[in-house]
């Protein structure tokens, strides 16, 4: 609710400064420009809900882009074949990281950091230069959009991001896997005692994260019409910021995919405002996101302490009643 309120207030402020924000063109542009980030952030939500972190997603985007550029431009593979191939590779990489995290009991931060360096290095081995992607399928997908009331054009990339969010909400709240993610994030030991296979769940969580990061890499390659080994640098931090601003606790167990969507939207809103203003440096986006992160982390800590105090007070009352 806090994230939604921040977004609404921010949008109203932008509207008072620039009436053009009322146009559906602006909203559609925000969706298109942040489609790849929104897709990544959905996967990151599941990871953070489980109490983990995935630092490899930016490198997954880079590898996906250069692999597709090589496969389509140099090896003559059709995008319709290359897309599912790279998706399988991405999911397999995530499953491997998830297995290492659970089997070796090494923090996810370390394993995914290693994955980040590994894939970034492999991307440079494939190509150090930006490789343009020229293919009719890419031309069709990049131009695919639907006109909506107000003159806006909802692109296929923006629509795909919204569909991923809807699917993420369903998985998180209407499936056994979603319940397992929340249970592991709340208390992994208790989840084990309830009969939940933490290894299987962890593997699927990181498979989902890198799978969606690969999908985001496909979207990003369509958006830029190129593959580049430097693509996606810092995107993992933007995704984490979106998830935290969206209300998901970094300690795990609490949060929603819908909140993450508004976290992404807030970042897009700030970027668009800076573009409309024309006098502000793009670095103000990072400054604003940093301030919001400080505020939301402080709120999270405050709510956590309040909850713990209430729990302790309830236990004290029960103990006192029992002793009498």
Model-found features: residue ranges?
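Transmembrane helix-bundle core of multi-pass membrane transporters
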Residues: 108-174, 201-203, 224-229, 276, ...
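Hydrophobic alpha-helical segments embedded in the membrane of multi-pass proteins
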Residues: 34-44, 59, 63, 92-95, ...
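Membrane-interfacial amphipathic/re-entrant helices at transmembrane-helix boundaries
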Residues: 1-41, 75-81, 196, 204, ...
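Cytosolic-side transmembrane-helix boundaries in multi-pass membrane proteins
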Residues: 1-8, 12, 193-200, 270-324
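Single transmembrane alpha-helix segments in multi-pass membrane proteins
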Residues: 10-75, 99-106, 243-257, 291
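Short loop segments and helix-boundary regions at transmembrane helix junctions
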Residues: 53, 72-74, 91-134, 171-176, ...
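Helix-loop-helix "hairpin" substructures at the membrane interface of multi-pass membrane proteins
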Residues: 78-86, 92-97, 101, 149-227
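Transmembrane alpha-helical segments in multi-pass inner-membrane proteins
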Residues: 213, 223-290
């Amino acid at each position: 609710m806090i994230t939604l309120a921040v977004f609404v207030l921010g949008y109203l402020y932008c509207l008072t400064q620039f009436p053009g924000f009322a146009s559906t063109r602006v909203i559609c542009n925000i969706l298109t420009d942040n489609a790849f980030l929104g897709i990544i952030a959905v996967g990151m939500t599941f990871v953070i809900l489980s109490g983990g972190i995935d630092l490899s997603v930016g490198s997954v985007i880079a590898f996906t882009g250069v692999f597709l550029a090589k496969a389509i431009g140099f090896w003559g593979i059709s995008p319709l074949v290359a897309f599912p191939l790279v998706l399988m590779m991405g999911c397999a990489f995530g499953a491997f990281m998830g297995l290492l995290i659970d089997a070796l009991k090494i923090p996810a931060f370390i394993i995914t950091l290693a994955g980040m360096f590994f894939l970034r290095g492999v991307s440079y081995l494939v190509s150090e230069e930006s490789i343009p992607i020229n293919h009719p399928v890419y031309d069709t997908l990049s131009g695919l959009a639907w006109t909506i009331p107000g003159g806006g054009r909802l692109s296929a990339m923006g629509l795909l991001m919204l569909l991923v969010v809807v699917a993420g909400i369903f998985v998180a709240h209407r499936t056994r896997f979603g319940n397992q993610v929340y249970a592991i994030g709340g208390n992994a030991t208790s989840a084990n005692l309830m009969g939940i296979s933490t290894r299987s769940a962890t593997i699927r969580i990181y498979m989902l994260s890198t799978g969606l990061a690969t999908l985001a890499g496909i979207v990003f390659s369509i958006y830029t019409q190129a593959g580049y080994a430097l693509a996606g640098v810092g995107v993992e931090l933007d995704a984490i910021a979106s998830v935290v601003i969206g209300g998901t606790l970094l300690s795990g167990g609490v949060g929603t995919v819908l909140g993450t969507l508004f976290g992404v939207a807030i970042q897009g809103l700030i970027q668009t405002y800076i573009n409309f203003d024309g006098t502000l440096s793009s670095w103000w986006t990072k400054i604003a996101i940093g301030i919001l992160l400080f505020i939301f982390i402080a709120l999270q800590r405050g709510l956590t302490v309040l909850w713990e105090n209430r729990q302790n007070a309830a236990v004290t009352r029960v103990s006192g009643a029992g002793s009498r």
